[in-house]
A protein has these predicted regions:
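Catalytic-core helical/loop segments in enzymes performing group transfer/polymerization on anionic/lipid-linked
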Residues: 1-235
Length: 235
């Protein structure tokens, strides 16, 4: 959970990370987050906090950014619907997450091939919608006659209307896990490799399975540092 609005629009972050050996989005080497997940030193109290926090995020429909309207953009349908998540071009999490431009095309083509009877919806990144950056999939999605979703929308409004999610390294994939959706990862985000996602790549260091509550406790409660946006005091 970063902030109310987008960082590119000047909204200050309400969460920060201090990592002494790497960074969470760099799968090429260990990070403090990865070590926390592997160690699994989670007491029952911490896991209970994680479970309650996940329930609160679901109830209040909170996301990494929290400025977008929470309203249905996609119509209801009896047809299966698959969400494919684009990212901003040059996002460090892409290159450090074992992905390239070709990975995004592979993801889109796999979504189409694996879900032949489904509607494929390609979600464009908020920074691209804001005109601040470029993405990877816009032209490819149009060429393949996919539905392109460029509305600025709360991710939970999308989760309500899709059956499956495809990502490269986007954090939206982890939020989809919180929403109890199946997630396919074509890169190596921090939440891949722990038995919770359908992984198209592997990381030898991540050789253990973890629960959603364990992963959440490590990433959101132990790894991140938060500041109250009103008092500016550490939470």
């Amino acid at each position: 959970m970063r902030s109310l609005g987008l960082g590119v629009e000047g909204f200050q972050p309400h969460s920060l990370i201090v990592d002494t050996c790497g960074i969470y989005y760099d799968a090429t080497r260990p990070s403090d987050l990865e070590k926390l997940i592997i160690a699994a030193d989670f007491c029952p109290t911490l896991l209970s906090r994680a479970s309650k926090a996940i329930a609160l995020l679901r109830h209040y429909r909170l996301s990494k950014y929290n400025h977008a309207p929470d309203r249905p953009t996609l119509p209801t349908t009896d047809k299966k619907r698959v969400l494919v998540v684009d990212q901003t071009f040059g996002d460090p999490s892409v290159s450090y997450g074992a992905a390239t431009v070709a990975t995004f095309i592979e993801m889109l083509d796999s979504a189409l091939a694996e879900n032949p009877d489904a509607e494929i919806v390609v979600k464009i990144h908020p920074d691209v919608i804001a005109g601040k950056k470029q993405g990877y999939l816009l032209e490819a999605a149009r060429a393949r006659h996919c539905r392109v979703l460029s509305d600025n929308i709360n991710p939970w409004a999308l989760f309500d209307r899709v059956d499956r999610v495809y990502v490269v390294t986007s954090q939206l994939g982890f939020e989809a896990l919180l929403a109890r959706l199946p997630v396919s990862c074509f890169g190596l985000p921090f939440y891949a490799g722990w038995g919770l996602t359908d992984d198209r790549q592997s990381c030898p260091r991540r050789a253990v399975s973890r629960t959603l509550e364990q992963l959440f406790a490590a990433a959101y409660l132990c790894y991140c540092r938060y500041a109250n946006p009103y008092t500016l005091e550490r939470c």
